From Swiss-Prot:
Family: Belongs to the universal ribosomal protein uL3 family.
Record's protein name: Large ribosomal subunit protein uL3
Annotated keywords: Methylation, Ribonucleoprotein, Ribosomal protein, RNA-binding, rRNA-binding
Organism from which the protein derives: Chromohalobacter salexigens (strain ATCC BAA-138 / DSM 3043 / CIP 106854 / NCIMB 13768 / 1H11)
GO CC, alphabetical: cytosolic large ribosomal subunit
N5-methylglutamine found at: Q152
One GO BP annotation of this record: translation
Amino acid sequence: MTIGLVGKKSGMTRIFTENGASVPVTVIEVEPNRVTRVKTVESDGYSAVQVTSGSRKAKHLTKAAAGQYAKSGVEAGRSLMEFRLAEGEEAPEVGGNITVSLFEAGQKVDVTGTSKGKGFQGAVKRWNFRTQDNGHGNSLAHRAPGSIGQCQTPGRVFKGKKMAGQLGNERVTVQSLEIVRVDAERNLLLVKGAVPGATDCEVIVRSAVKAR
């Protein structure tokens, strides 16, 4: 199964097992994902299903997006997300809903989100560089990165050099997290461990690649 769900991170809590062990979980609220389009090999060159969730005012839509929602007869959502279909995988109908019942407790999933932005940070925090000596003549350079290259040859800093810069606010995927509980009545997924992003940010839940 390659179809996933678009949800919203609600925060973290913990639950207790029958043995009394405390398990940290992330609560993901998954409103029913509405199918807006089904792509096929004949018409688009590949098989995929396009979904949306939540709601959005019509005045905030582009003409292209408004036309697509009108064509499919689906209420406009926050964003459009596409999931590729595996060969032979059955596609849902346009206008139908995909709910949390897609997953079950004990299943492994990959969760994708946008990590918290931490602004401009130095090499020690951004790349876990060790700090320089506190003594032995060193002053004002305890958290400096040190040498970043050579001299006249090559006369430049190589691309990809680990230096200070923007930390966070990037797309991150955490793989093989276990679903502890599925609450179909309240549209909730309880996933063991932490997932990327701040509270109320959008996350994508897919079946784990390494478990397929």
